[in-house]
Amino acid sequence: MAGTVASPEGITNPPIDDLLTAADSKYALVIYAAKRARQINAYYSQLGEGLLEYVGPLVETHVQEKALSVAMREINEGLLTSEPIEQQ
C-alpha cells in the first residue's frame, strides 16, 4: 500500500530518553515497568472473578495492546510514582 507506514509502538514509543527521567537507571526502569505490567495483567485476570484487588490501566488502552506498553505510557505521562526500597 502506497503511503502507509506502520508507526512502531511499545518500547519505541514513548522514547527511552523520556522514560529514564522517571527512574535512576535502565535496569530500574525495566523493573518498574515490569511490576506495573504484572499488576495490569492481574487486574484483567481478576475481572472474571469479581475481585478488585489491583488497579487497572490509568491510560486509554487498545484491544491488542500489551500490558508493558500500557505501563510505559503510564510512566511517561507521570501517572505513577516510584519509591526506592531501603536495604536493611
Curated annotation (Swiss-Prot):
Disulfide bonds: none annotated. It comes from Kineococcus radiotolerans (strain ATCC BAA-149 / DSM 14245 / SRS30216). GO terms for molecular function: DNA binding; DNA-directed RNA polymerase activity. It holds the Pfam family RNA_pol_Rpb6. Its EC number is 2.7.7.6. The keyword Glycosyltransferase does not apply. InterPro entries: DNA-dir_RNA_pol_omega (IPR003716), Pol_omega/Rpo6/RPB6 (IPR006110), RPB6/omega-like_sf (IPR036161). NCBIfam families: rpoZ. SMART domains: RNA_pol_Rpb6 (SM01409). The keyword Transferase applies. Promotes RNA polymerase assembly. Latches the N- and C-terminal regions of the beta' subunit thereby facilitating its interaction with the beta and alpha subunits. It comes from the Bacteria. This is DNA-directed RNA polymerase subunit omega. Keywords: DNA-directed RNA polymerase, Nucleotidyltransferase, Transcription, Transferase. GO terms for cellular component: DNA-directed RNA polymerase complex. Belongs to the RNA polymerase subunit omega family. It catalyses: RNA(n) + a ribonucleoside 5'-triphosphate = RNA(n+1) + diphosphate. The RNAP catalytic core consists of 2 alpha, 1 beta, 1 beta' and 1 omega subunit. When a sigma factor is associated with the core the holoenzyme is formed, which can initiate transcription. GO terms for biological process: DNA-templated transcription.
